[in-house]
Amino acid sequence: MSDSGTPAQARISLFVGKGGVGKSTLASATAVCDAGAGQRVLVVSTDQAHSLGDVLGIAVPPTGQGDPVRVLAYDPEAGGGFLDALALDTLALLEGRWLHVVETLDRRFPGSELSSIAPEELCALPGIQEVLGLHAVGELAAARRWDRIVVDCASTADALRMLTLPATFGLYVERAWPRHRRLSIGADDGRSAVLAELLERIRASVERLSTLLTDGALVSAHLVLTPERVVAAEAVRTLGSLALMGVRVEELLVNQLLVQDENYEYRSLPDHPAFHWYAERIGEQRAVLDDLDATIGDVALVLVPHLAGEPIGPKALGGLLDSARRRQGSAPPGPLQPIVDLESGSGLASIYRLRLALPQLDPGTLTLGRADDDLIVSAGGMRRRVRLASVLRRCTVLDAHLRGGELTVRFRPNPEVWPT
């Protein structure tokens, strides 16, 4: 609840990871535990595979109407919460949103002919379904019906594309048709006015999404991995990508970890393949975790055991996290936060420095660019537009270097615009 007594906007928890690591299971388990702790929780699937209902053990049919299924509810008088589930049908979302937009714009601009474009034709536009799914999650959080929205995202590549599209779309729309030009379109140019109004609506929506995603108080990512080398390598890259995008990582969950009894000597085993396999897998998993520590540091981990039975249904899911243990350590790498200071000099002889922490990014993929008042940072297939501090907007770039995961860009004043 907020100070005014009205429900606060729900926190959004994004469960991200490689396909098959157990995102749906751990997202559902987290939602079940939060509901049991008295919270009003909604778990949402944006993955078109939609295995959420399979994990929860109930039917959760995909829908574009935003009508959730009640999974469980505890006694509210005893402080219990409830859990709802929703599988987003982004194709149905697209159809509903497009028909609403056409109806609204047709009233303002009769004869626009937007109604001649079928929603099915828009499906070919890259990323439109992902953006609509993310927009729907934002609307659900703003509805204040729940305290927490747990999002079961698609596999890593699709999830990262979903998270980067709002900022990317806004960037290219502004470059292709700047806002001041769009707003100067006269009413006599009906077709251009319709297009300008449509883009303005989209721009406002994606701008709100970009702002929401980088609000660490409301949005966080939960990175799920298994103790396997290929999966761990992708998780490390994902950490860097999320940091570059400005999304706060709340925790790393290592799923399907074989339980090891410290009081048992695993080297003295009966001569049977099952025992040898178990001991070898434990050793491999331990080696993967050691390599992970060497790469990202002693980061806190949630260690989820590999159970004999598949956890399906609220009771089993709640027990899964009850059996997990937390390994203490440092917080995951934080999102990109620019730090600006004066390195030396004064006036036109000043040298200013912009520092950005870029953890777990491949230096060979790092490129920089500048567009007006923004610094464009690209790495590992991701791109982030960083608004420069006011003092740096009147400067030109002197040089840049990357050392130990920290990017330093130096600036010198531009005599043509520097105040005298």
UniProtKB/Swiss-Prot annotation:
GO terms for molecular function: ATP binding; ATP hydrolysis activity. InterPro entries: Anion-transp_ATPase-like_dom, ArsA_HSP20-like, ATPase_ArsA/GET3, HSP20-like_chaperone, P-loop_NTPase. It comes from the Bacteria. Belongs to the arsA ATPase family. This is Protein Rv2184c. It comes from Mycobacterium tuberculosis (strain ATCC 25618 / H37Rv).
